[in-house]
Amino acid sequence: MRYFLELRYNGAAYCGWQRQPDMPSVQQTLERALTTLLREKIEVTGAGRTDTGVNASYYVAHFDCEEPVPDPAQVVYKLNFLLPGDIAVGSMTPVGADAHARFAAREREYRYYIEPRKNPFTRDATWQYYVPLDMDRMNEAAAALLEYDDFTSFAKLNSNNKTNICRIMHAAWTADERGVLCFTIRADRFLRNMVRSLVGTLVDVGRGRYTPDGFREIV
C-alpha cells in the first residue's frame, strides 16, 4: 500500500533531504520514525533533493507498506511525537501504486532571502549580506533565466546528473518593508546547489561585479 506524506521541516540540522553516510538527513530521520511506528522496514521517496540547511514549507514524499494503515490520521499524530521538533508531518493520504512523489511533481519553488543587516533571529534562515544591492539590475539578469534551459554553468562539479536541462517558469527578486530581499524561482527541476549558485552570481550583478549582459554570458 502506498501513502503520500505532506510535511515541512527546518533544514538547519540536516545535510539536506537525501540520505547520506554518517550525516543526518531528513529522509533518514523520517524513515527511522516510520519504521519504528509501523514495525516494518520503510523507505521514503521525496519530491526532490533539498540542499544542506534548506527549509521546506511544503514537501511531499511517499512510502510503501505491506498492510493498509487503518487510521492514517492517528499515524500522523504519533509520527509527530516520534519526530524531532524540526520536522512536522501534516497529512498522510493513501494513493495508487503508480503515484510517485517525484515524478508527479510538475514544478518546484525555492525562496532565498537576503537580509541587509545583522539579525540574530533570522541568521539560520537568511543570508545576511551588508553590501548595497541594485535590485533592478538583479531582476534584469534574473529575467534572462527564462530564456535558457541548460544550466551546466550552475551545476555542482562531479555531480551524477543525467542532464543539466531545467525549465524555469519564474525568477524574480522582491523586497519587503524592512529591505529584506527575496529571490523566488520556480522550475520543473533544480540541480544540486543550483539555486545557491544562481543567487551568488545574481548578487554579483547587484553589487556591480557583472552586468546583466555579463550574467547572460555566464549562463
Describe the function of each predicted region.
Residues 1-219:
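Structured-RNA-binding interfaces characteristic of tRNA pseudouridine synthases
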